[in-house]
């Protein structure tokens, strides 16, 4: 079986690319949840207890901490969902559990961590290093020589300025880059930045 954990919006969005990727294996596509119910979009919904180590699963949860918590407890092995419209260039390493939605791209010599989610029309350019459990919302522009720390969230339409081989642009662990932000400088661990140019959000 190839299982999608979660029947929320993102999980349902992944049905199309999953079927396209699986081809003749698409009959084995299921949703998996902790408390199963009837079919969703014609896809069977099973319990986590029904998964085995022979099955593959991807976790369709946007929240990084929750995604990691679920991934760590599932018995099935992490799969990868790479939409047929995705383009992956040479010398690219992709970690287990990664999801590349339709019309995404990784150009060359990039390192992609475990359970990365790359939503529609986002790209990762040359020599980038993406950590584990990172989320890219739609239309993220991650230019060359950018390092993104574990569990960071990059919002819709954000632009990450190109770094250099000697000084990559760094997005810290657990940082949040707001939608439409233009990031020209490093972002600290756990920081929230918004705007153009992106600046730390002033909290009340």
PLM segments and residue spans:
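Conserved acidic residues
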Residues: 29, 55, 96
């Amino acid at each position: 079986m190839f299982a999608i954990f979660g029947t929320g919006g993102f999980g349902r969005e992944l049905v199309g690319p999953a079927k396209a990727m699986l081809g003749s294996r698409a009959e084995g596509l299921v949703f998996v949840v902790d408390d199963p119910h009837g079919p969703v979009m014609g896809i069977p919904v099973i319990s986590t207890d029904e998964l085995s180590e022979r099955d593959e699963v991807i976790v369709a949860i946007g929240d990084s901490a929750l995604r990691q918590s679920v991934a760590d407890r599932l018995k099935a092995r992490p799969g990868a969902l790479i939409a047929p419209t995705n383009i992956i260039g040479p010398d690219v390493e992709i970690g287990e559990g990664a999801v590349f939605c339709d019309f995404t791209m990784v150009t060359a010599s990039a390192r992609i961590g475990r359970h990365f989610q790359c939503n529609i029309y986002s790209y990762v350019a040359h020599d980038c290093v993406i950590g584990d459990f990172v989320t890219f919302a739609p239309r993220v522009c991650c230019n060359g020589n950018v390092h993104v720390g574990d569990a960071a969230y990059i919002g819709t339409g954000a632009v990450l300025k190109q770094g250099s081989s000697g000084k990559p642009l760094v997005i810290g662990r657990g940082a949040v880059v707001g939608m439409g932000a233009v990031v020209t400088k490093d972002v600290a661990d756990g920081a929230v930045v918004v705007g153009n140019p992106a600046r730390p959000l002033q909290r009340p």
